[in-house]
Amino acid sequence: MNKRLLFRLAPGLLAVVLFCACRPAVIEKGNLDVIPQPQEIVLAQDTTPFVINHSTTIIYPAANEKMHRTADFLATFIKEMTGTEVRVSDKEKGSNAIILAVDTTMTHPEGYKLEITPEKVLLTGGSEAGVFLPILKDGKVAAALPAGTVTDFPRFRYRGFMIDVGRHFFPVSYLKQMIDLMALHNINYFHWHLTEDQGWRIEIKKYPKLTEIGSRRDSTIIDWETKKFDGKPHSGFYTQDEAREIVRYAADRFITVVPEIDLPGHTTAALASYPELGCTGGPYKVLCSFGVFPDVLCAGNEQTLQFTKDVLDEIMDIFPSEYIHIGGDECPKSRWEKCPKCQAKIKELGIKALPKHSKENQLQTYFMSELEKEINAHGRRMLGWDEVLEGGLTPNSTIMSWRGIQGGIEAARQHHDVIMTPIQRLYFSNPRINKMTGFEWMNRVYNFEPIPAELTDAEKKFVIGTQGCIWTEWTADSTKMEWQILPRMAALSEIQWTLPEHKNFDRFMERLPEMLKIYSDLGYGYRKDVFAADTVAVKQ
């Protein structure tokens, strides 16, 4: 069976994949080249390993279907990698067993303890996810496992990765491959950026023109300096059934899909579909170039507000995520300053210019707060980019700080949850950073510290996680995508998972070759010039 297909058919590789592979019929001990680095590894003085053989049984908790599926897959994977056929059961067995267990009293739901003795392997998680995550520590399995104990848990509860499909569309099949990659790195949130000036990518049944018109553009800019276009139509969108398929696929890997509908800026594709939603009435065209553009949704138009609420209602029906991302970034106010409806709404609301917040910025806060009410009414929470700070924060919003860490600092000081994703470190499509040598390129990600030192201990608790982002203005295919992501996603995973006192860049780079082998085995491409000896940057 193809290894990549096997990996995708059923998630989970076996807790003991903390260790290296061996060939069939060869007993070989594994090593501890693990990414992300566990919090604690203690090798036993007794060097007798646990040996997987035909008498080994994988035991899962009775009546737990998730664990049953995982156990079945482990058996399949062990046979694929070692040639040994093992049994699966929900009945207790004294020895020669790999036991999967859940202990909900553990402090961390995603934490786990892995105990290996010569007689058995016991993997206990704080939840099914806690069992699943160590199962994805590696892409290989050894027939002989060194005795010892691993105690592990994540540093952050939000460990995200974002993919922009608005600028360039990627099919469901490829997104599944990316979700597998996220699972391999213990990432638990897939932030799906679904709408842009250059394309609306999700079916909304009440507004069919969003995909009939908004998902298509005539051409795409391919050279910023010469303004050269490729002259080729670009299109694509996901049906609601396909989106639900992605949600299920991710959930099977304990990953939550966070949808983003970018509002009120970056909405030219929506305006091309329904021009009455803009301040000027159009005509508008789905954009073929990239940047920040003046035409945005009209915040003073009640029809526009109803449109956005209708869209969000359908989105929340598809996506069960606690978080619903509604953008808020890069929204120019020039149209609002001259729009009679926007100015009338400012007057109606009694908005006055403030030293830190213009009237139009406060109008955006009003607009976003109305959407937040809709989101909260469904028991969800609003996520927004750090520009939503500019008009004053909405009551329960979570901030994604992208222009640096300062927005995150400001939000944390106001006791709002924060996810750090600064462009200078964690935008994997940043052209300036991608011109660095591979070693610098890796180091820049690995040594990012998400919790600013200037925050108090109480404020630091509001930094709930961090996220890498891939924007696709200049990323039109999987080769370019993977070159930019890998192996930096491995560095990201240690930021997200491993406590700072257990991190070390030199040791990380020593462990990295094992992960590179896994990428190759699973069919992913990656940037290869990432070690200290590689001093010349490679063209993308």
Model-derived segments and their meaning:
Residues 22-157, 376-385, 389, 393, ...:
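Acidic, contiguous N-terminal accessory segments
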Residues 85, 188-189, 256, 381, ...:
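Residue-level detector of anion-binding/catalytic polar loops
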